[in-house]
Design a protein with these regions (language model features):
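Conserved SAM-binding strand-loop segment of SAM-dependent methyltransferases
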Residues: 98-110
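A short acidic, Gly/Pro-enriched loop at the edge of an enzyme's catalytic core
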Residues: 113-121
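C-terminal alpha-helical "lid/dimerization" subdomain adjacent to the S-adenosyl-L-methionine
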Residues: 10-13, 155-211, 215
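Conserved SAM-binding loop
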Residues: 91-92
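Conserved class I S-adenosyl-L-methionine
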Residues: 2-48
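A short glycine-rich, Lys/Arg-flanked "PGG" loop and its adjoining helix->strand segment in the class I
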Residues: 136-148
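Conserved SAM/SAH-binding beta-strand->alpha-helix loop
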Residues: 84-86
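Conserved SAM-binding loop of SAM-dependent methyltransferases across substrates and taxa
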Residues: 62-73
């Protein structure tokens, strides 16, 4: 089997579409997902931005959220980090076409390089790709990266709301991203980890989708 066809090694983050060779299809597919635009708008609103703020995105993906954010708030400074070189190449191309200035960096979201320097940290649809221990490490990173008075916004799969959402999550999302990685989202352990990592946490939005229930939290240390 070619190396590019293999699933990621044990303990590594799951790529956007599970296999690295499918990464090129991620951007066209995500544009067809109706919940993506709704989530992007909600996250940007929840960040409550002002000119001059410094932002960190954990898990840049193809850059769609970062690009939309910079279009609406050109006077913020934005650094977007991802572990996947291929998806970062896509993100940089998308940003160049959009004419926005974003610092896309390859890095481990569980190992911060700059502590206490960001006004806002945010992450969308990334944590369900991470192993359970890495989820907690990334939450710690988000908290430690914030300046006093800063906030963290995270949107990802949450506890399924109802039997249909539970079934959809189990049939679609869990096989795609791995049962071990996604189980904490299904059973509430991810929400508990978020609430345990920050002093103030509020659930700001819940969306039911064809792959399961999404939830957005706004957090302060």
């Amino acid at each position: 089997m070619p190396t590019s066809s293999r699933p990621p090694r044990r303990g590594a983050p799951i790529p956007a579409l599970r296999f690295h060779w499918l990464t090129a299809l991620y951007d066209p597919l995500i544009r067809t997902w109706g919940a993506a635009a709704t989530m992007r708008a909600a996250v940007i609103d929840a960040l409550d931005l002002a000119p001059g703020m410094r932002l960190l995105e954990l898990g840049a993906g193809s850059g769609r959220l970062a690009i939309e954010l910079k279009r609406q708030h050109p006077d913020v400074e934005l650094c977007a980090v991802d572990t996947d070189h291929a998806i970062l190449q896509i993100a940089r191309r998308n940003a160049a076409r959009a004419g926005v200035d974003i610092a896309f960096q390859h890095g481990d979201m569980t190992c911060p390089s700059e502590l206490g320097t960001f006004d806002r940290v945010y992450s969308t649809m990334v944590f369900h790709h991470l192993q359970p221990a890495a989820k907690q490490q990334a939450l710690t990173t988000a908290c430690r990266a914030l300046r006093p008075g800063g906030s963290f916004v995270v949107a990802d799969f949450g506890r399924p709301r109802g039997l249909l959402q539970l079934a959809l999550f189990g049939l679609i999302q869990q096989p795609l991203d791995g049962f071990r990685n996604t189980a904490p989202h299904r059973d509430g352990r991810f929400e508990h980890a978020v609430r345990s990592s920050f002093g103030q946490v509020r659930s700001a939005a819940v969306w039911k989708t064809a792959a399961g229930t999404l939830e957005m939290f706004v957090c302060k240390p």
